[in-house]
A protein has these predicted regions:
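N-terminal, polar/Ser/Thr-rich
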Residues: 24-45, 57-59, 497-499, 503
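Ligand-binding face of N-terminal immunoglobulin V-set domains in extracellular IgSF glycoproteins
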Residues: 44-71, 75-76, 85-89
Length: 536
């Protein structure tokens, strides 16, 4: 029989280790920032403190910081090379005054200036050498003084435009992600894949009084002195801090029944045919039911985010064409409510998933995209099960003839479009494996075909299980904010999903099959399936 004292000691050690590990995981980086905007010179002057706690079980003597604004400094950065790969020439032909960069003046620990340098091939990554090792769970404070030259917004929609409007995201220097004992040194590639953990912010802005300032952070104080506005923000558990400076206040604030607040400039037509609050309430409530509630009190939904990654093909089916000075041709094939709801749904779920999951979004982008598409499929199944992909286009008459009605595409359900699009990509032989790193994918596969393929695959799993197993697993995954490995969570002894992870996502093989010699008898059906290489 085991000695009770030994048993007690072992139990105590196990509990202590568990609590210690949990404490390490729970520690968050805190940012205290004082920033002054000079919009005329396109500059931001920043004084910043980073309160960093070692999340590892080993001691550290090196820290890495991400300075993604510095990715805009010249044509030799990884971001510039990404622009070239995407055949975007505006960055290369722009004047130097349109580019962006960071001048880092000083970096201090509480007692000493620190040695730092930028990585040679990644000028948006900063390496800092600490004067002494930082023990597991120990905290240190870095003090930084730097100046940001804001890039022109024409490159990525982030930055400043010619009218002086400023949109900032991933703009301040932050600690690079640290996972599984390794630093993730990822440069800015304009992929919307910042992978840092949720952090706490205390931030004060000083800016010209011509501006209205909107943020996803909670505003706590606001005053004006000598033509300058001073606004203080404080918030916790934020993966990023977004700010919009605009001379016109284009945002609406909508309090929700659950106590949260939505702030958005993604608005419906001015005709008044859309009940904005009711539409937002329905989308938010559905997300809360399908997954888990949004992790923060304030929800910022940006039109610029939707414009950067819109619902593919939707706008082309909802427009008006001017055919003369006083006459327009109405090519609106969806109701204003449905059209706005889909745009809101796309933008909200994108914001929701990105702000909830603190995962490696460059390598695990397929999780983000798949959940996004899956959520939209489920929403349409719930509220618009009979909606067609082409809307009323199939009924559109030219010379009194409905030319599309007899074609199969006119019968496609709205959700059929996801499969239709990725099958088109496969038939064109331009598809790529979903599990490839995001920076290896073409833009079409990254934004459209890949997420569609993964989302439809998740819906296949749910239909095959015919129960609430998958929805409950997805809730569990989102409830833990990505701390559980998605693949490990779904791979269980009772569920054989090798086909999904190893074949459907990783290999992504396509097959060109043909059914021939079809025979039907009273009690059976016989046919042959022939592939492109004629094997049967």
């Amino acid at each position: 029989m085991q000695n009770p004292f030994v048993f007690f000691v072992k139990s105590f050690v196990c509990v202590a280790l568990l609590l210690f590990t949990s404490n390490l995981i729970a520690q968050k980086t805190k940012y205290k920032i004082d920033a002054t905007l000079d919009s005329e010179e396109r500059l931001i002057f920043v004084k910043q403190k980073i309160i960093f706690t070692n999340p590892d079980t080993e001691k550290l003597n090196v820290l890495f910081l991400q300075d993604w604004i510095n990715a805009y400094k010249n044509t030799q950065t990884p971001l510039a090379k990404r622009f070239a790969e995407d055949f975007s020439r505006s960055f290369y032909s722009s004047a130097k005054s349109k580019l962006g960069f960071t001048v880092l003046d000083t970096v201090h620990s509480p007692s000493n200036p620190l040695v730092w340098k930028r990585l040679e091939d990644q000028p948006d990554i900063i390496k800092i050498t600490l004067p002494e090792y930082l023990a597991p769970g120990a905290t240190t404070t870095l003090t930084l003084n730097y100046t940001i030259k804001i890039p022109d917004s024409k490159f990525t929609r982030m930055g400043i435009n010619d009218s002086g409007k400023v949109y900032l995201n991933h703009w301040n220097i932050v600690v690079a992600p640290f996972r599984k004992g390794k630093w993730q040194l990822q440069s800015n590639l304009n992929l919307e894949d910042y992978s840092g953990p949720a952090s706490d912010y205390e931030l004060s802005w000083h800016y010209p009084n011509k501006y209205h300032l909107t943020s996803n952070l909670i505003e706590t104080k606001n005053n004006e002195v000598d033509s300058l506005k001073h606004t203080h923000f404080s918030d916790v558990d934020r993966i990023q801090a977004d700010f919009v400076f605009d001379t016109s206040n284009r945002f609406l604030t909508i309090p929700l029944d659950n106590g949260k607040v939505v702030v958005t400039d993604l608005l419906p037509p001015s005709s008044g045919s859309v009940d904005l609050k009711a539409t937002i309430e329905r989308v938010v409530k559905y997300a809360d039911t399908l997954f888990t509630p949004f992790p923060n009190q304030k929800i910022l939904i940006l039109k610029s985010s939707y414009d950067k990654n819109p619902f593919y093909g939707l706008s082309q089916l909802q427009t008006e064409v001017r055919i003369s000075k006083n006459k327009t041709l109405n090519l609106k094939f969806f109701s204003d409510t449905f059209f706005y709801e889909i745009k809101l749904l796309k933008a909200y779920f994108g914001r929701y998933i990105n702000q909830t999951l603190a995962i490696d979004k460059r390598e695990e982008h397929w999780v983000i995209g798949g959940l996004h598409t899956y959520a939209m499929i489920k929403y349409i199944e719930t509220f618009y099960p009979d909606q067609k992909f082409l809307g009323k286009l199939a009924e559109f008459k030219i010379l009194n003839l409905t030319l599309l009605k007899k074609y199969s595409v006119a019968k496609l359900g709205f959700n059929d479009a996801y499969e239709f699009i990725y099958e088109f990509v496969e038939n064109s032989n331009i598809h790529q494996a979903d599990k490839q790193s995001k920076d290896k994918l073409s833009k079409f596969n990254e934004k459209i075909a890949g997420p569609n393929h993964v989302g439809v695959g998740l819906r296949y799993i749910e239909a095959y299980q015919n129960n609430d197993w998958l929805p409950s697993k997805l809730k569990e995954y989102l409830n833990f904010k990505g701390k559980l490995d998605f693949e490990t969570l779904l791979r269980t002894e009772d569920e054989d999903l090798d086909w999904f992870f190893d074949l459907y996502l990783k290999e992504r093989k396509s097959f060109d099959l043909k059914i021939k010699e079809f025979q039907k008898t009273t009690d059976s059906i016989r046919f042959k399936v022939v592939s492109r290489d004629r094997s049967e």
